[in-house]
Amino acid sequence: MARFTLPRDLYHGKGALEALKSFKGKKAIICVGGGSMKRFGFLDRAESYLKEAGMKVMIFDGIEPDPSVETVMRGAEAMQKFQPDWIVAIGGGSPIDAAKAMWIKYEYPECTFEDMCKVFGIPELRKKAHFCAVSSTSGTATEVTAFSIITDYSKGIKYPIADFEITPDVAIVDPELAETMPKKLVAHTGMDAMTHAVEAYVSTANSDFTDPLAIHAIEMIMNDLVPSYNGDMAARDRMHNAQCLAGMAFSNALLGIVHSMAHKTGAVFADYGAHIIHGAANAMYLPKVIAFNAKDETAKKRYGVIVDYMGIAPKDASDDEKVKALIAYLRGMNDQLNIPHCIKNYGADSYPCEQGFVPEEVFLERLHDIAVNAIADACTGSNPRQPSVEEMEKLLKCCYYDTEVDF
């Protein structure tokens, strides 16, 4: 038996943030990063709408990109003191992901972070509070998913929390919020969304319910991501819907090893000042993983179907030719978005940059542990081709050096 779960309500279109006025409750806590949502007035608007609904409002701000276990615990402690019956997370993937984990700890104070990371092992929520997610970036789609990503910086590892219990009750997809994204964020989150859709379509858990969402998301991203990156606000608005569709698909079809690798490489080089932003990691790894997965005949045929919908190769081309066309197309899209093709070149587009570089000797020294951790990641189980540790090491090397995947 399979399951398909979405938020009960999804408000979309410009002005959708006003839906907060209709919420019923006594207290609401707003979880936010604090930067752009404050600067552009969306935090003030959210607070005023909730107060208009008759609620007392508390703001928990300062949630960092790639939120830490410590931030989750601080937020849960604030919730215990305030006792909200609504948790409203507003911003990109980081504040929403953090708030989801805080929600678990708020409802179950005895729950440890290790408990949260047990796949589909979260106890029943909503005994204390309901959850609303308001997305401001067009990529993570965490506003509609059963996932959260939290980083344990003491280990340098990002851990996915996966359970349908943390699917938000309400999602607000208001494109006005996404219009504030800086150019680089448009690129990274957009390729995150493309990866979600492609991985969902070839996942071993794909279904008749998720396939149409994934394919339509791919078509929309193909048409709108690069124009959005170049300042077309109508395309930016459509991308906000596209990434949400991709999220609905992958939340139910699950993901694959692009995400496993991104989770385990994102923070592991942080001690060298080299943080590989999640969307950029996905963009770099996706073409390599497609080449690896295409050795599986079922996956190869499904990549071929994606190419048929995209129209980037003749219908009568072989599946092998279609896979090559898809890889070439995605690499070309990365070029247009100024995203490098490999870890070795990561950060070269904006030196000196906030990400830093990943030294070759450090990468090779940590390669085995990264491979082991990637295989243990929750996303690996639904990948169409299961890699050995040795194969994962080879694949990661291809992602570092931008070499051909021929195994």
Residue map of PLM features:
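ATP/NTP phosphate-donor binding region
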Residues: 1-86, 343
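Carboxylate- and glycine-rich phosphate/diphosphate-binding segment that chelates Mg2+/Mn2+
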Residues: 147-253
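Glycine-rich phosphate/pyrophosphate-binding beta-alpha loops
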Residues: 139, 244-282, 377-381
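Gly/Pro-rich interdomain helix-loop hinge
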Residues: 268-271, 275, 279-362, 405
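Glycine/threonine-rich beta-strand-loop-alpha-helix active-site module
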Residues: 70-176
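Flexible, glycine/charged-enriched surface loops at secondary-structure junctions
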Residues: 204-213, 228-238, 253-258, 276-279, ...
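Short, amphipathic C-terminal "tail helix"
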Residues: 361-407
